[in-house]
Amino acid sequence: LKDQGKLEEAIEAYNKALSIKSNYAEAIYNTIDLLKTYSPESVESPNLFNIDDKIKKLSPKILHATSDSEIIDNLAVGLNYLNEESFEYKTPLSQIYKHNSVDLNCKRHAKIFNTKDIIPKFCFGCFKVQVEVPTFIDLVKLTSLFYKFDFEEDLTRKSIIELRPNISGYYKGLIYCYGLDQAKAVKVILDISLNKVFDEKPISFIKRGCSEYPLKFPSYGEIPKNPKKIMTFPKEWKPLEKKFDQEELIEPKDNITASLPEFCLSDFYIIQKWIDYAKGIGDQSIETFIDRPIIFPDIYKKAKMRSMH
């Protein structure tokens, strides 16, 4: 139902499933995922919907906070809402997306790269504006900025904790752009906003495609001043990409609903994961949350290992 764009019917179906079995993991995940894009008008509901509604009502206080302490206080309120759940839900996600209604089909592209040792043609037009920030609180501020940031086009953006062992850095934000010219224009607008939000403006830069690609093909990651010198899709890769699609076609999804521009239940489960990561790397900005139990020990351990290198 969700994939057909029938969101209200999907909510009713998940609602029914959860009323029968409140700890039904798949229904919980699907419900939380759907609530990122849709708020039901009314649900005579399991706790899940009520908590999402409370967090969405709390969201403006975080989005428009004027100090770090205000952000921290409101995060604490939202995290306490999660404790109202009677079941243990652990999100598999670690990135907060504000996605548009276009599926970039990144799963396909990553699989082609990993199985065929080539970069798919689509990815040669993919450019991102990346921002790196020093602390957990700054990552929340960046996420708020991404929710409020208004482009002529609704570009997908995300905030992440870096977990990939061969990629440097900790806290990052990325905006997906269609081509280098758009990325340059977005960076100019973003830099103005970053100056307003942060006392010390974080560094932003344009990168091409996924970070793994230039590790294998360094020329792909180079963005020369003369655009004619940029690496283009090698013709000899075309049959390999075609063969992949013949063997294992991964179609982009239709009927994608854009994310709501606000914090929601899904985000707060991810924020809990970010806090555990921050504890692992010794980030002082989470001092207020230091007594909260670690919910994601695997993330805490990965972060701790990361901080040792």
Region locations from a protein language model:
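Short proline/glycine- and acidic-rich turn/helix-capping motifs at secondary-structure junctions
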Residues: 163-170, 200-229
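Charge-rich, low-complexity segments
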Residues: 25-143, 158-160, 223-227, 233-309
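Position-specific recognition of the canonical hydrophobic site in helix A of tetratricopeptide repeat
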Residues: 1-2, 36
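Helix N-cap motif at beta-to-alpha junctions
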Residues: 135-136, 177-184
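Short amphipathic alpha-helices in soluble, non-transmembrane regions
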Residues: 142-146, 185-195
